[in-house]
C-alpha cells in the first residue's frame, strides 16, 4: 500500500501552486482551517536548508539535470525532463490530498526574459496537463489578480505578500532560514476565493 495516499481525504481542499523552475511553492488549504501544509520543490538544497525543520513546511529536492554545454535539441529535451521531475513531485502532493480544486499562478509575461518565460510557460502547461489527466479542476490566476485579491494591490512587492501572509498564518512568523516568497504566493492562491 502506498503510504503517501490519504485514504480519508478532507471534505474541502484547495491547493495553491506558484510554479517555478528553481522553487515551486505549494500551499494546501484543508477545510479553510488555521493550519496549512506547505511544500517547496527546489532544484538544490543548501546545507542550511537541508537541516531546516518546520511542522508545516516540507522542502523537496527534485532531480535537476544540467543543460550547460549542451546543443539546442539536447538542452530542450533535458529541460522537458526537469519539468517532468517537478510535475512528478506535484502529482505526489495531489495524490496525497485529493484537492477539490487547484489554483495555479499564471505566467507573468512582463517580468522575465523570453527564454525564462518560455520555460515557465512550459512548466505551467505540464502542470495543467497532469491535473487534466487526474480530472482535478483547476483555475489559472494572474499574478496581478492574486496580489490584488490578497493585499488589495495588484503591484504588491514580495515583502508585502510575505507580511500579509504572516498576518494570516502566525505559525510561519519565525521562518527566516529559507526563501518563502513562493509560499506566500501559493498561500494567497489557496485562499483566493475567500477574499
Tell me what each language-model feature is.
Residues 1-195:
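Phosphate- and other anionic-substrate recognition elements at nucleic-acid/protein interfaces
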Amino acid at each position: 500500500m502506498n503510504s503517501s495516499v490519504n485514504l480519508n481525504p478532507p471534505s474541502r481542499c484547495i491547493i495553491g501552486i506558484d510554479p517555478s523552475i528553481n522553487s515551486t511553492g505549494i500551499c494546501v488549504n484543508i477545510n479553510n482551517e488555521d493550519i496549512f501544509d506547505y511544500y517547496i520543490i527546489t532544484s538544490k538544497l543548501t546545507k542550511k536548508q537541508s537541516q531546516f525543520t518546520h511542522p508545516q513546511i516540507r522542502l523537496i529536492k527534485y532531480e535537476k539535470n544540467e543543460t550547460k554545454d549542451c546543443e539546442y535539441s539536447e538542452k530542450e529535451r533535458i529541460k522537458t525532463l526537469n519539468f517532468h521531475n517537478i510535475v512528478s513531485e506535484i502529482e505526489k502532493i495531489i495524490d496525497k490530498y485529493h484537492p477539490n480544486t487547484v489554483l495555479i499562478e499564471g505566467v507573468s509575461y512582463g517580468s522575465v526574459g523570453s527564454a525564462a518565460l518560455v520555460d515557465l510557460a512550459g512548466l505551467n502547461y505540464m502542470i495543467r496537463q497532469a491535473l487534466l489527466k487526474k480530472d482535478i479542476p483547476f483555475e489559472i490566476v494572474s499574478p496581478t489578480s492574486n496580489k490584488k485579491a490578497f493585499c488589495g494591490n495588484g503591484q504588491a512587492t514580495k515583502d508585502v505578500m510575505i507580511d500579509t501572509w504572516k498576518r494570516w498564518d502566525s505559525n510561519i512568523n519565525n521562518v527566516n532560514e529559507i526563501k518563502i516568497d513562493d509560499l506566500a504566493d501559493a498561500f494567497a492562491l489557496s485562499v483566493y476565493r475567500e477574499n
